[in-house]
């Protein structure tokens, strides 16, 4: 029983780490060009002031905005091959950094 629980715990942690790594890679691929420097008014990664009002919209709305494009941001940012779920991972990654 302990082995069963431990193996599932390890598998869950490996999966969570993979998602974190995936989110970072997606961010670097499609978001960092603007969100690391504030290009065209993009809120910078980790900047609490710039994200404060936006973060109140919640992950789902921010993901939809990123998917559709908003303001100076094109649809899907610079990740035209990303799925909705990948865009969501990138949004979650950015929110976790504030």
Question: Which residue stretches match the model-derived regions?
Answer:
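Extracytoplasmic/secreted proteins, especially bacterial periplasmic and envelope-associated proteins
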Residues: 22, 26, 50, 61, ...
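Local sequence-structure signature of Cys/Sec-based thiol-disulfide redox active-site neighborhoods
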Residues: 21-30, 40
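The canonical Cys-X-X-Cys-His
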Residues: 28-37, 90
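Gly/Gly-Pro-rich "capping" loops immediately C-terminal to redox-active cysteine motifs
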Residues: 35-64
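Axial heme c-ligation environment in periplasmic c-type cytochrome domains
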Residues: 44, 65-89, 94-97
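N-terminal export/targeting leaders of redox proteins
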Residues: 1-21, 98
């Amino acid at each position: 029983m302990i082995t069963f629980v431990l193996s599932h715990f390890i598998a869950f942690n490996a999966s969570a780490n993979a998602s974190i790594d995936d989110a970072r890679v997606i961010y670097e691929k499609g978001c960092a060009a603007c969100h690391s420097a504030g290009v065209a008014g993009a809120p910078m990664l980790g900047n609490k002031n710039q994200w404060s009002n936006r973060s109140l919209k919640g992950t789902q709305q921010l993901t939809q905005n990123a998917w559709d494009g908003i303001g100076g941001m094109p649809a899907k940012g610079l990740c035209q091959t990303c799925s909705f779920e990948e865009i969501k991972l990138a949004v979650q990654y950015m929110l976790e950094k504030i």
